[in-house]
């Protein structure tokens, strides 16, 4: 009788060890899931920050592009006016409207 009772104790001990092992594995899995959730939250926050930064960069770059476009337009107009004045003087000298 004691031999069979001793085997039962081993079986119960083995089952408890297995249950403890499964419990440890489940605890690790829950910790990993929580860490993953925290990592996802951190990643989402970084993504939102990056999105806001990219919007700011987009508007700033558009303003800079517009500023340089106007600067180029002003330079082209200035060059055209200078060329027109030079051509006007050449024509006026050639026609004799301005005495030499």
From Swiss-Prot:
Residues 1-74 are cytoplasmic. It comes from Bos taurus. Pfam families: Synaptobrevin (PF00957). This is Vesicle-associated membrane protein 8. SNAREs, soluble N-ethylmaleimide-sensitive factor-attachment protein receptors, are essential proteins for fusion of cellular membranes. SNAREs localized on opposing membranes assemble to form a trans-SNARE complex, an extended, parallel four alpha-helical bundle that drives membrane fusion. VAMP8 is a SNARE involved in autophagy through the direct control of autophagosome membrane fusion with the lysososome membrane via its interaction with the STX17-SNAP29 binary t-SNARE complex. Also required for dense-granule secretion in platelets. It is a single-pass type IV membrane protein. Its main location: membrane. Residues 96-100 are vesicular. The record marks 32 as: Interaction with STX8. It is found in: Lysosome membrane; Late endosome membrane; Early endosome membrane; Cell membrane. The gene is VAMP8. Residues 11-71 form the v-SNARE coiled-coil homology domain. One of its GO terms (molecular function) is chloride channel inhibitor activity. It comes from the Eukaryota. One of its GO terms (cellular component) is SNARE complex. GO terms for biological process: autophagosome maturation; autophagosome membrane docking; defense response to virus; mucus secretion; negative regulation of secretion by cell; positive regulation of histamine secretion by mast cell; protein transport; regulation of protein localization to plasma membrane. Gene3D superfamilies: 1.20.5.110. Belongs to the synaptobrevin family.
